[in-house]
């Protein structure tokens, strides 16, 4: 199994309906190939972790990378893992408002990622949320 973490920027700020559609499709697609993960959205920025069988994660990531709705896709980490950090989450999620408009995103994300035992992974998500709240 592997875990892949990436960040990207949406071409347009996603509406709540857009995010609901993204999550619905992600959960359906991920469950079908045994991929789990977490998506945090702050304004137009997305931070996402995907974990599961290597072929499934890489296929999912490449499909996401081809999506024209976003750009500046940067892979932050990709590592072999022996256990999942996101359990049975086909795709957990937390959405904030535009950067600087949502001080609660930090607390929400910190609570969401508290069970994650990998401090580096947890730090990516909490750091992202803190930057979104402070921007």
Feature-to-residue mapping (PLM):
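Charge-rich, low-complexity N-terminal segments
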Residues: 1-135
């Amino acid at each position: 199994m592997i875990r892949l973490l990436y960040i990207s920027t949406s071409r347009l700020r996603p509406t709540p309906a857009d995010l609901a559609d993204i999550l619905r499709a992600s959960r359906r697609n991920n469950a079908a190939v045994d991929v789990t993960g977490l998506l945090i959205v702050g304004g137009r920025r997305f931070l996402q972790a995907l974990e599961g069988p290597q072929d499934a994660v890489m296929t999912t990531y490449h499909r996401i990378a081809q999506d024209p709705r976003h750009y500046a896709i940067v892979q932050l980490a990709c590592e072999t893992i022996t256990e999942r950090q996101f359990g049975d989450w086909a795709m957990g999620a937390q959405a904030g408002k535009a950067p600087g408009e949502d001080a609660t995103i930090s607390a929400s994300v910190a609570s969401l990622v508290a069970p994650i035992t990998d401090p580096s992974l947890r730090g990516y998500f909490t750091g992202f949320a803190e930057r979104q709240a402070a921007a």
